[in-house]
Amino acid sequence: MHRELKEFSHPHGSTGIYEDNLQVDVLIVGAGFSGIYMLHELRKQGLKTVVYEAGSDLGGTWRFNCYPGARVDSQVPLYQFSIPETYKDWTWSTNYPDYKELRAYFDHVDKVLDIKKDVAFGSVVVDAQFDTSQSRWVVKTQDGRTAYAKYFIAAAGVSSKRYIPEWEGIENFKGPIHHTSFWPEHEVDVRGKRAAIIGTGASGVQVTQAWGPQAGHLKVFLRSPNYSIPMRRKELTADEQNQLKPIYPQLFDLREKTFTGALVDFSERSALEDSEAEREAFYEQRYQTGGFDFSTANYKDTMLNPVANRYLYDFWAKKTRARLNDERVKDLLAPVEPPYFFGGKRSSLETDFYEQFNRDTVELVDAKSNPIVGFTENGIKMQDGTVHEVDVVCLATGFDTTTGSMINLGVRSIHGTTLQEDWSQAAETYLGLTVSGYPNLFHLYGTHAPTLFSQAVTTIEVQGRWIVDAIKQMERQAIRSINPSREAAHAWKLQIRAFQNASFFPTVHSTYMGGSIPGKPFELVSYPAGMPMYARQIRDALPTFPGFEVVKADGEKVENLAPGGLEATTNFFERLFGMPPSSAKEDLAKQDH
């Protein structure tokens, strides 16, 4: 059973991009969507750019997540690059591709953009620090190599730090046991066997759908119900996609103008304005459409008004309970009384998840009232002493989401502190792109960006263009480094907290609030005000870099420390929440100092 990325350290060479003491303009960590996009765009600027990738091929999460049933929950063509060369001769077989088709897509991207020539595979970054005397990042890998770069880009996403609870005796389990994100390439055979799935997040739902029809007996261990929504997957033809390609540029432009970076947006109506019959009809239409339209294209007050939220939950629970046969299972998977607000945790998309529990061979284990405490050689031990004997275990236990991915790189500040130390009480970034004390470090699809509230590729391209433009300005203005001030970072954080505290998110432990990692700060880790507002705010920081300490090539320091763009949220906040963010900021500032 793999636990850490460093176990995959196995560089594919010792010369060229694999050489020790590598000198580059830009070093990127991660060769998924983020890293590939940044590499392509920065090479166009004439910058010597190299990517360090822990895995053995392109694709990021889709190289590691090859568990049974693994499939993206964003629809194409939105879940792909807007780069014309990449979509001109590419078509998909379905609106929700599986990991195999996504791997084929990345192979196609490499073919047309020649990506792999600048990607060093099997290269696991374990230490990085900015040398102020050279104005260069010094980056070290697990196998002992060092690289030097003016710009360092963390493109490791939100799920590169896996989470496996420290259950007693887990190392003694005799059968196959794998985390979904460290799944082996070979098939894990469960036919005729006793199998267990621990966790019912996105990957747990998908493995349940795959193993339910195959396993001799399947036990699914549940702590909290997942408000899963029908995916409504359908087959796509090449002809229908090719007919749409002339308007792809407009679609890619539109996705940056919606709240979640998809092609739909919230209804401007309140759930309380419609009659019961009108609400039911509206919910039914959203439900039949499938996908995240059910939550992200719903009434505007669903996540703000408890009554509106309960209306949506009741509709979902009624639909879901009707698909289940057993009353106990109904009460665990879709309780009459909601255990948390709808949308408080990220819903998953499913095809026949609930129907699996109508099989005689599939059993739902309540791991909340009777938690897992450890493993024996042959099974899973519960708090009351019960042992569930199984042959195969799938750990769908998730990630140290968002913040864990950057901390996992071992980055250290110019003050000598580690990012883990700096973020031990609360994460702070500026613009969801930079961190105070870490000059010339950029991160994307990570902490304090729209990340978990958005379509991934939309966020990546919006942030990626900003990073490219920031670097272009630095080169044009002969700037050696930029470092966001603590004041600017704190102002950005207070803005996010103001949104957090006016919403339902702090009412439950969730991925949005940092996950369930022991000792991790309980805080909103993504920017919640939507894609258009985010894009406008970060653009306000160019080309003059408000909120940054700027060091020129001659050593002159220019302190433009007043944060830019934060007041852009005022009108939006008042329209959405009925109160200005300033009062929330003042209250929070009193708490923080």
UniProtKB/Swiss-Prot annotation:
Pfam families: FMO-like. This is FAD-binding monooxygenase acrE. Binds 1 FAD per subunit. FAD-binding monooxygenase; part of the cluster that mediates the biosynthesis of acurin A, a highly reduced polyketide coupled to a serine via a peptide bond. The activities of the highly reducing polyketide synthase acrA and the nonribosomal peptide synthetase acrB are collectively responsible for the synthesis of the acurin A core structure with a heptaketide backbone produced by acrA covalently fused to a L-serine by acrB. After the formation of the PK-NRP hybrid product, it is detached from acrB by reductive release to set up the formation of the lactam ring by aldol condensation. It comes from Aspergillus aculeatus (strain ATCC 16872 / CBS 172.66 / WB 5094). Disruption phenotype: Abolishes the production of acurin A. The keyword Cytoplasm does not apply. Its cofactor is FAD. FAD binds at T61, W62, R63, F64, D73, S74, Y79. Keywords: FAD, Flavoprotein, Monooxygenase, NADP, Oxidoreductase. NADP(+) binds at R71, V72, D73, T200, G201, A202, S203, G204, V205, Q206, R223, S224. PANTHER family: L-ORNITHINE N(5)-MONOOXYGENASE-RELATED. Induction: Expression is positively regulated by the acurin A cluster-specific transcription regulator acrR. InterPro entries: FAD-binding_Monooxygenases (IPR050775), FAD/NAD-bd_sf (IPR036188), Flavin_mOase-like (IPR020946). Pathway: Secondary metabolite biosynthesis. GO terms for molecular function: flavin adenine dinucleotide binding; N,N-dimethylaniline monooxygenase activity; NADP binding. The record marks R346 as: Transition state stabilizer. Belongs to the FAD-binding monooxygenase family. Its EC number is 1.14.13.-. It comes from the Eukaryota.
